[in-house]
Amino acid sequence: MPVLDNDADFTPSLGSPGSGVVITGGASGIGLAAAHALAAVGRPVALWDINAEGAAGSASIIEGRYGVRAAGLSVDLRNPQAVTPAAIETRAAIGAIGGIVHCAGTAEATGIDGVTPENWDAGLALHVRSLLLMTQAFREDLRSSPGSAIVALSSINATLGNGMIPIYSAAKGAVISLVRSMADELAGDGVRINAVSPGMIDTPIMTETKAQLPGHFERRIMLGRYGAPEELGRVIRFLMSDEASYMTGAEVVVDGGNINSQRQ
């Protein structure tokens, strides 16, 4: 029977490895919270976002606050040609890359009848295809950097479904499937990949929903409130660190007890 190694090191290692991390959707919300959480333990960060001004401003704040290298890049992940040049610029800005955190996304309320070939393709490109393209672009970097990891944001809507946002829900389900599919091959590179599925988090994407349905979601959540972006940031930081060295191909649900709640 295996026994505990009395010489095992239980010193917290949230800052290990110390390699750079690329964070999509890094100008706001969960992506920005993840950037702060990682920078706080000494990891350089590159914030990729369609909002160029927001990415640059957030990177400047992070660099000044934590004393790490930080860069803000304008990247439209719906364009497959944007990934390679952004990867080159990122390496030049923050050095060795040992992680990807994929948070970029939109949730367009279309219902079934509002789905078009154009918005369907755009949604899948942003949420799913870009994760694959970034993994391809940085695969050699990750393979060369011990302890490398990827975290991709999914959603509880991948499990529950949501009739108002079918593109988003389908894309987030695909993210989990892609994470599980890539985990096997990436393990051979020494690279871990996991998905995080948030519940109702107080981010800019939820502002309109909160205003339209005050108290609606809080009643359904065991903890009785929306989550804060920084609560997700801490979970992402854990998964990106050596603390989670035996986790890959997993979905981590962070929803305040929403999925398991029987409340109406």
Set out the residue ranges of the language-model regions.
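Short C-terminal tail/terminal secondary-structure segment
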Residues: P2-S13, L160, R237, T248-Q264
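Substrate-binding pocket helix/loop in short-chain dehydrogenase/reductase
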Residues: G111-I112, T116-L124, F217
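Active-site loop-to-helix junction immediately N-terminal to the catalytic Tyr of the SDR YXXXK motif
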Residues: V115, G161-S169, S181, T209, ...
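C-terminal substrate-recognition "lid" of short-chain dehydrogenase/reductases
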Residues: L132, R225-V254, I259
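Active-site helix of classical SDR
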Residues: T135, A171, V179
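Alpha-helical segment proximal to the catalytic Tyr-Lys
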Residues: E140, D184-G188, S245
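Residue(s) in the substrate-gating loop at a strand-loop-helix junction
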Residues: S155
